[in-house]
Design a protein with these regions (language model features):
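NTP-dependent small-molecule kinase module
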Residues: 24, 128-164
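Glycine-rich phosphate-binding loop used to anchor ATP phosphates in small-molecule kinases
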Residues: 51-96
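A glycine- and Lys/Arg-enriched "phosphate-lid" helix/loop adjacent to the NTP-binding pocket
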Residues: 90-136
Length: 164
């Protein structure tokens, strides 16, 4: 049974690849953005224990799944249950281009305009990927990838999803 973790910078193609795998392999999909944050303005992270409970409910309800996000602290919760990881390690310029071309994500934003209003902040966030030292950073993602002992793949450029 496929149990796949996909991670990388914002705009790296995590959701696109996850959606493709869901369609082609019949996997259940969990976007960690949907459970990592409180519904506050400005956004605030939920306690890890709350997110962990939701993740465990998801994996216990599904035999095969793909979980995607940039949160290594949350990915570690299901690392042992996964069968494969995919590190979307695209250049920052590609991530920015992808973010600019991103279709509306109604599960994250009430309107396309709200998503577009957040774009400048997102581009800045993407650009800081290699400079940050948090759970969302390149350093954290590389450490997670290097420490994983199962099947793993690193994708370093935009490619058609069929080739992933």
């Amino acid at each position: 049974m496929a149990k796949i973790l996909i991670f990388g910078n914002s705009g790296s193609g995590k959701s696109t690849l996850a959606q493709h795998l869901c369609k082609t392999q019949g996997l259940a999909h969990l976007d960690l953005d949907t459970l990592a944050w409180k519904l506050t303005s400005p956004p605030e992270r939920k306690p890890i224990d709350d997110s962990e409970e939701e993740i465990k409910t998801f994996i216990s309800s599904n035999d095969k799944w793909v979980i995607e996000g940039c949160y290594t602290d949350l990915l570690k919760i299901v690392e042992q249950q996964s069968t494969e990881i995919i590190f979307m390690n695209l250049p920052i310029e590609s991530c920015i281009s992808n973010a600019k071309a991103r279709p509306w994500e109604p599960h994250k934003y009430k309107t396309k305009q709200a998503q577009d209003d957040n774009l400048a902040m997102l581009i800045d966030w993407i650009g800081q990927y290699t400079e940050r030292n948090d759970t969302f950073s390149y350093a954290a993602h590389k450490q997670f990838y290097d420490g994983y002992h199962g099947h793993k793949k690193m994708i370093t450029q935009n490619v058609p999803t069929e080739q992933c």
